[in-house]
Amino acid sequence: MSTGLADNVRKYRRTAGLSQEGLAEAADLSLSTVRKAEQGGHVSMETLHTLARALGVSTSTLFATDAPKSVLGKRDEANRRYLAELRRALMPAVGLSAPLSDPGEAGELSELRRGVQEGHALYWADQYGAVAKRLPGLLRSSEAAVSALEGEEQEHAMIARCHALLLTGKYLTQVRQYDMAYFALVEAIRLAREAHQAQLASTGVVGLCWLLLRQDRFDEAEQLAAQTAREIEPRMSEATPAHLAVWGELWLRVASAAVRNNRPEVAREARRMAAAAASALNTEDESFPHHWGGFGPVTAELKAVEDLSLVGDTRSVLRRTDDGILSDKSVRNFGRPTAPNWGRHRLDVAHAHVTLGSHQDAMDELMQLRRTSGEWLTHQPMARYVMADILKTRKRTLTEDMRSMAAHLGVAG
């Protein structure tokens, strides 16, 4: 943790009139954790959120600018090689004249649209390597199509390229290549606006807000999502399912940012708006690229339960996870949410179990996710936090499943 952030924790503690012991008690954290935070040691975002809540400030208030830590290592070097072709297609070298790279041949628009759908299906199927191999060709051929066509056909080509960029941004955000993802998403939003496709641009904003959340840019994510949601607010009686879905997704982003930033009133109102959109939709919908990801009554409820996890109400997480809208009967009625949304929810359940000392129940959740979404799981910090807690707190000998999962997630005992 940066010295500036440590200074901020100390400053706001003193402003609140609390000793270190008093802050530890107010936040329900150990005294050693508070001391670690004020000494510049590494603490999780969950801990920072807990400290901010106890201090009565937004989480982002505690942040401070400092030099980043080195990320050099074998994995960083490997990732640069793995993404070299995609980087060239997305971010070509540019000089005083034309780009150095050849965009290739213009693809048929129907083939481009089909390629995006096939790539997205691979993304949902946890086939990240296959997605990475497919994206460079989609980006080059869609760029060439925009350059080669004119008039109405060019506008259709711009929309097809926007779809390819949205898929690229989604994939790169998932695998935590944030700067590349930002480039793809901002370019998609720009193209959609240029083509007068407000709903498509809003889909890009949903993706960009997800990226901002992953970068802990809570204020910006909340403000951008709320502003866009107000600009595209639908008439419920006339709105298409895709319009309702993207509007609801924007409110989900507002809520996610606000709850992480210790703004519970804003989060509650945003959840209410998302629930209204989900109720009007009355089913789960995942029609990318007409909207970003899955949305519907089940997804809206999953995200409300996520709020409970973020504020440490683990018993309520477990109580609501198989009740009401999340019961088996309701899920069958409304439709199953997307694999990433469902997986994130089950990680919240695993986290609740391990917090309450139910190691085997937590492992059951992790093992099921490994069977269904093993590659996705390796990109989830929450999975590593849960596994690390199991290794740290379990008093008995680790099971074979525990050792195997720790190796899969790269968590040392």
Place the predicted regions along the sequence by residue.
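A short, Lys/Arg-rich alpha-helix, primarily the initiator
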Residues: 1-15
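Conserved hydrophobic/aromatic packing and binding residues within compact polymer-binding modules
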Residues: 9, 20-24, 32-37, 62
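The alpha-helix within a helix-turn-helix
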Residues: 13, 24, 52
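DNA major-groove recognition helix of helix-turn-helix/homeodomain DNA-binding modules
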Residues: 28, 46-61
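Recognition helix of helix-turn-helix/homeodomain-like DNA-binding domains
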Residues: 28-43, 66
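Short C-terminal boundary/hinge segments that cap the last helix of small helical domains
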Residues: 56-71, 300
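Short, charged recognition helix plus adjacent turn
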Residues: 65-94
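Conserved binding/catalytic microenvironments
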Residues: 104-413
